[in-house]
């Protein structure tokens, strides 16, 4: 798949923050109408101290049949800095994206979207590169305030930055911690909530796109795929 190259990656942290502040102005929070046919999940892991592994899994929806899996392993040069995840993981994701043959209608990232100090988590940032609707799904809160949803499957609450709604907190599995969902690009809060609920099977905490992508990253790390 093609993508737009919007900036250099070899930037010091202070310049990376400036890039984020400029790119956030380009984000479009729009409703996603209808149902997707193909959904992608993205997961990144770090087999070594300076080595990263990116996996993209494309699924048919609503069957969640796996249609394609691509991966990219390479050197990581940007340091781990909260809020600058895209500069650490983005280049590997884009190299994996180049290998993809099946164009997804929606891409789900293991990370943040709008729920970010500068409103530009990895789902938003990469959404601008690929110009496809994206959603960020995180296992923990990076930014924002919320009221804990009740311990009932599919209960939820909004995630706020002041009075602005920037995402939602969804209890996808009873007895488990909630997940933090926020729109990336070409997506809005209500659509991301609706889709992630639909992408998460009963008894699972994590939606199928990123859950399956994570399984493949673990298999690749162990040399089983």
Swiss-Prot record:
One of its GO terms (biological process) is DNA repair. The keyword Transferase does not apply. It holds the Pfam family Endonuclease_5. The record marks 80 as: Interaction with target DNA. Its cofactor is Mg(2+). GO terms for molecular function: deoxyribonuclease V activity; magnesium ion binding; RNA endonuclease activity, producing 5'-phosphomonoesters; single-stranded RNA binding. Changing residue 139 to A: No effect on DNA binding. No effect on cleavage of DNA containing inosine. Strongly reduced cleavage at apurinic sites. Residues 139-141, 214-221 are annotated as: Interaction with target DNA. Mg(2+) binds at residues 43, 110. It comes from the Bacteria. Disulfide bonds: none annotated. It is an enzyme of class 3 (hydrolase). DNA repair enzyme involved in the repair of deaminated bases. Selectively cleaves double-stranded DNA at the second phosphodiester bond 3' to a deoxyinosine leaving behind the intact lesion on the nicked DNA. In vitro, can also cleave single-stranded substrates with inosine, double-stranded DNA with apurinic sites, or DNA sites with uracil or a mismatched base. When present in molar excess, two protein molecules can bind to the same DNA substrate and effect cleavage of both strands (in vitro). NCBIfam families: endonuc_V_Ttgales. This is Endonuclease V. It comes from Thermotoga maritima (strain ATCC 43589 / DSM 3109 / JCM 10099 / NBRC 100826 / MSB8). The lineage of its organism: Bacteria, Thermotogati, Thermotogota, Thermotogae, Thermotogales.
């Amino acid at each position: 798949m093609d993508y737009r190259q919007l900036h250099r990656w070899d930037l010091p942290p202070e310049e990376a923050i400036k890039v984020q502040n400029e790119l956030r102005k380009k984000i479009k929070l729009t409703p996603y109408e209808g149902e997707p046919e193909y959904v992608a999940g993205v997961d990144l892991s770090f087999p070594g101290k300076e080595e990263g592994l990116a996996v993209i899994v494309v699924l048919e929806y609503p069957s969640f049949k796996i249609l394609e899996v691509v991966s990219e392993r390479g050197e990581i040069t940007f340091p781990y800095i909260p809020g600058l995840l895209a500069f650490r993981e983005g280049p590997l994701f884009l190299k994996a994206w180049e290998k993809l043959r099946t164009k997804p209608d929606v891409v789900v990232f293991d990370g943040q979207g709008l729920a970010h100090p500068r409103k530009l988590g990895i789902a938003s940032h990469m959404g601008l590169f690929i110009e496809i609707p994206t959603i960020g799904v995180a296992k923990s809160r990076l930014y924002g305030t919320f009221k804990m949803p009740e311990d009932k499957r599919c209960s939820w609450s909004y995630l706020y930055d002041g009075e602005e709604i920037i995402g939602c907190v969804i209890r996808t599995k009873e007895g488990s911690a909630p997940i933090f969902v926020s729109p990336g690009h070409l997506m809005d809060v209500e659509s991301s909530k609706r889709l992630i609920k639909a992408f998460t099977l009963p008894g699972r905490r994590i939606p199928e796109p990123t859950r399956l992508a994570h399984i493949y990253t673990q298999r690749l790390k162990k040399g089983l795929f």
